Amino acid sequence: RRVADALHCSLEQLLSELALHHLDLVLAGQAAPRNPNLRLTSERLVDSPVEWYGPARLVGKTERDRFPQSLNDLPVLLPTGHSALRPTLDHWFEAQGLRPRIVGEFEDSALLAVFAARGLGVFPVSRLGADDVGLMRGLRLLGSSDGVKEEIHAIRSRRGQHHPLVMQVVAAARP
């Protein structure tokens, strides 16, 4: 199998590999689906509030003061529907009465941030990832999506639960 193929796969593929004991741990944005045949356990490690950032030329005092309504007037970059966060954001948009102008959808959150840093739009990121956003010049905080959180789940097979490195990763991630 090519390295590129191994780096891009669906959650279902990862869970299959986990069930076959080819992997010991999967960190995902959602819990494993209930399936007694897979014999997997999920544990929510973290939930982090979602904030919005954008380039300085798009995010001024007026946009911050009008947030979240300002999302109706700004170009918006979002994760694709494959992301666990996207349905939550779509529900939040609806609850807030927002109709954002979506100008791009990305599978890769780092690429999404690069496009924003180049001035192409505003984007959501969990507070966990906000420190990395700060490394990109010219991005400013627009606002916070009240009630929207991004989750990280540790998904393990029963055999993988006792792997020393898995135990160490999970313990380090707990609050």
Regions found by a protein language model. Give the residues of each.
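Short beta-strand->loop
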Residues: 40-51, 127, 135-149
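A ligand-binding cleft/hinge motif common to bilobed small-molecule-binding domains
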Residues: 27-37, 110-139
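Flexible hinge/capping segments at coil-to-helix
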Residues: 37-81
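Central regulatory/effector-binding core of bacterial HTH transcription factors
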Residues: 1-35, 106
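Residues embedded in well-ordered beta-strands
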Residues: 25, 43-44, 51-53, 75, ...
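Ligand-binding cleft/hinge of the Venus flytrap
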Residues: 1, 70, 86-99
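Short secondary-structure boundary segments
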Residues: 30-31, 56, 126-129, 145, ...
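A late-sequence structural motif
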Residues: 140-175
